[in-house]
Structure formats: structure tokens, C-alpha cells
Amino acid sequence: MMEIKVPMRVSELLKTTVENRHREKLGTIQDFMVGADGRLKYAILSHGGFLGIGDVLIPIPFDALMTGYEKGTVSLDIDKQTLEKALSFESKTWPDFTAVEWDEKIDRYFAAYKAGASQQQPVAGSV
């Protein structure tokens, strides 16, 4: 769903604000993960906290993101409460992204928000 001018540098998306359809700030993009196929798999969203203190990192499937409503933003069609239930980790304890279970849980949780998906809500506790 990422409808941005391509090609573009990934670095242009670092520190970009991510908002939902209600224009609530969900966080900022802090990093990216590349899959085994060489494509961008996840945008790593910094969420919560204050000035980077106390925040958690949430891997968001790259294809769940869209251009934002405001210039210089990216949009994710999810409410804050649902986002807060997603798998997350602290910046000092990155998970093993090669673990199949981790990928499956993330993909299952965000399936409703990927391009072409129906607008069903993820099942709470599915991660």
C-alpha cells in the first residue's frame, strides 16, 4: 500500500511520523528489516515514551503502510489501542527475526491492514 514516488532512498523515510486515519501520531520510523528475498519486510516503529525514553519498537509489515495525510508522514490504518497489543520489543533486546514463529505472529496480527485485505480487526491476543 506504500504509494510513494519510486525509486527513493529508504533513508528519506527514517524518522518519518506515522499517523492513523484519525491523524493521531502512532510513532516514528526508526529502522527497517529486509527479508530473505532482499525486499523491505518491516518498518520498525518507535511507539510511546517521551523523547525516545520508555518507547517500544513495533515491527510493521512494510506493505501495511501508505503515504500519510500530511506531507512528510506515513499512514497506518490502525487505532492506538490495537497497535499497543502488537508484538513489540525494547531497543536493547532485538528479537531473532529469523525465527519463523516471530514472522508468522507479526504477519497474522497485521493481515487486516495489508494491501487488498478486508478491514477485519485482528483478534486480540493473537500475538
Model-derived segments and spans:
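Peripheral interaction segments used for macromolecular assembly
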Residues: 1-127
